[in-house]
Regions:
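Short Cys/His-rich zinc-binding micro-motifs
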Residues: 150-154
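Redox cofactor-anchoring modules in respiratory/redox and cofactor-processing assemblies
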Residues: 1-144
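Acidic, Ser/Thr/Pro/Gly-enriched interdomain connector segments
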Residues: 145-149
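Iron-sulfur cluster-binding cysteine motifs and their immediate structural context
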Residues: 64-70, 157-169
Length: 169
C-alpha cells in the first residue's frame, strides 16, 4: 500500500493479497505496491518516513490532516530520537484514530495506517525507543559494502546478487 498502507509482520506474509484480507490486518491495497523490509529496518523510523510523505502531500484543506499529521510527525521524531515517552504512544494512537475518522479525503483517512500498524505489530520497537531510550536497530551500524579490488574482475556478474545494490555499471 506504500506510504498510506499498513506495515505487516512476516507472520502475515502468507495471506492472500486482496482488499478484504489486507484491511482485516490493518493495511490496504493502495497503489498495489509492496515494500519488503528486514530486521535491519526500524519500523518506528519507517513509520516516520511514511508520515513525512503524507505531511508533504496533504492539501491542507482539512484540519485533522493538515495539523494532526504534523503533530504525529513531531511525536514520531521525538520517539526516533529516543526522547519520547509512553504517553506519546497513547497520544499517537488517539491522534491516528481522530485523523482517520475525521479527515475529508482518502489521503487523510489512510495517512495513519503505517503508524497504527507499526504500533500494533512492532510495539516492542517503540518500547525500545521510549523505555530503553536506545533502539538496537537504529543504533546498529548498517552494513557498508566494499569491493575487494584483488578479487573483482569488473565483469558485473555479482551485481545482481548484491543485497545493498552497491555494484553499478
Amino acid at each position: 500500500g506504500g506510504p498510506s498502507g499498513g506495515c505487516i509482520p512476516a507472520e502475515h506474509f502468507d495471506i492472500p493479497i486482496d482488499y478484504d484480507n489486507l484491511i482485516a490486518i490493518g493495511s490496504m491495497m493502495g497503489s498495489g505496491g509492496l515494500i519488503v523490509m528486514d530486521e535491519t529496518d526500524c519500523m518506528v523510523d519507517i513509520a516516520k518516513f511514511f508520515l513525512e510523505f503524507t505531511v508533504e502531500e496533504s492539501c491542507g484543506k482539512c484540519t485533522p490532516c493538515r495539523i494532526g499529521t504534523k503533530r504525529m510527525l513531531e511525536i514520531l521524531t521525538r520517539i526516533v530520537n529516543n526522547e519520547g515517552s509512553l504517553e506519546d504512544l497513547d497520544l499517537l494512537e488517539t491522534l491516528a484514530n481522530t485523523i482517520t475518522e475525521t479527515s475529508l479525503c482518502g489521503l487523510g483517512q489512510s495517512a495513519c495506517k503505517p503508524v497504527q500498524s507499526t504500533l500494533k505489530y512492532f510495539r516492542d520497537e517503540y518500547l525500545a525507543h521510549v523505555v530503553d531510550h536506545h533502539c538496537p536497530i537504529c543504533n546498529k551500524e548498517k552494513p557498508h559494502p566494499t569491493i575487494d579490488p584483488e578479487k573483482c574482475k569488473g565483469c558485473g556478474k555479482c551485481r545482481k546478487n548484491c543485497p545493498m545494490e552497491a555494484i553499478t555499471g
